[in-house]
Amino acid sequence: SGVLCAFNLIDLAGYAGEAGIGFNGSFTPHILATDTLYCGDMTLYAYAKSGIDQETVVGKFLNDVCHYTLEFQHLDNDSSNPFKAKFHVENGRVVPECTFGTGELKGLIASADENEPIAGARIRIYSGETLGENLVRTIYTDETGNYSVDNLTAGTYSIEIAATGYKKYDMQVEITENATVYNETLLMIGRNGEDGVGTVTGELKDALTGLPIQDMTYNIRKDWNNTTGAVLETGTFDASTYELSLNPGNYTLEIIKENYITNHINIAVVLDETKTYNVTLSPENSSIDTDNLRIVLTWGEYPWDLDSHLYGKDKLTDSDVFHTCYWAKNYYQGSTAIAKLDVDDTTSYGPETTTIYELNDNMKYSYYVHDYTNGYSSSSTAMAASGAKVQVYAGNVCYFTFNVPNEGGIWWHVFDYDSATDALTPVNAMSYSN
């Protein structure tokens, strides 16, 4: 260094160094979002470099004659830099990752006592399973209590629901790409009377037969869609009906019975009121393996009669091969059962169960629900308010749960299924004609 200092005095050679903070970024406007989403990917990094000064005799000689630059890059914008940070910005706010996707979430928020829509309720949506971290969106219900959020990436989201005068609670939802997920109606409990109790009651039924079942274990957890959290209460149901008294609030009721697939239902307990929540369990059955499907429809007290319709269509000719429903419950090829309407319920609640016993790769299957009670209406919204739910089982696992959209209609096209590709495509379309 002493020699370089001496050379520097006569401008023969010099050593130069430079350090600082570097920044770069790219911006993308997602114009397909309902409200244009401006995304930016930013990088902030420390840089440092040193070398022979290019303005000295030696520096100029190396550069002009030898075409060589003696320079050392100590820190740069590369993967080896320990002093480097990347972050994503959306509309001026830092978020963990880009939230633009093709998934959508819709639903309705209403009071649990009167089932009246709640306007201005707040919904905070967090990416992942931890509430309070990675806030993605904050939205509010409109004057009809409805909400909608689009452009969500596929994955698990934690949702916090709050409204003035009501108890706050949370739940988790799964968003899939290129599909609209409809939440069941989010019921809210008033803050008054937190020390009182309310009652929930219901019947316990076999999904395959529609007959009563008994002798099962139950667990109660706080909030909705909570299948793994701390258990607040546990016990047994010895009879085919049950009754529980709980403090007002939102809970997840887990039902466990030997040789049956465990089921979870969301319940809302209202002060000094009794609410009905029937429970349906699908039996474990080796004849329903992972190559076949069981579809279970349940709903509330009204309408009295919702009907299941399963269509099997030839993919090459686009023509119907079979249609199972209440007037044609079974479809056989020879002595082989292909599809059956196992249970047809006409007196509220369900279950109404359809099973595909033999899948055919040359066919496409479509499942519909029809509001038979209001079958000739061109304006009914009764099915939308019914709390109807469709669960799809393969083997001993419930793979899909569909909640009825909050839209008018007497036909609900729930999903299509292609057994050749094993692709179940949510449709969730409501209409007044099939």
Give the role of each language-model region.
Residues 1-99:
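N-terminal low-complexity, acidic/Ser/Thr/Gly/Pro-rich segments
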Residues 30-38, 146-156, 164, 238-252, ...:
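Short Pro-Gly-centered beta-turn/loop motif in secreted/extracellular proteins
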Residues 86-100, 173-195, 268-289, 409-417:
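Extracellular beta-sheet/turn segments enriched in Thr/Pro/Gly and aliphatic residues
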Residues 103-111, 184, 198-206, 293-297:
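A short, amphipathic beta-strand motif
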Residues 127-148, 212-216, 222-245:
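Short, acidic Ser/Thr/Gly-rich low-complexity loop/linker segments typical of extracellular
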Residues 145-147, 169-171, 182, 240-244, ...:
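Short strand-edge motifs at loop-to-beta-strand transitions and within beta-strands
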Residues 160-172, 254-266:
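A short, solvent-exposed loop/turn motif at the edges and junctions
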Residues 275, 279-434:
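Intrinsic-disorder/low-complexity signal
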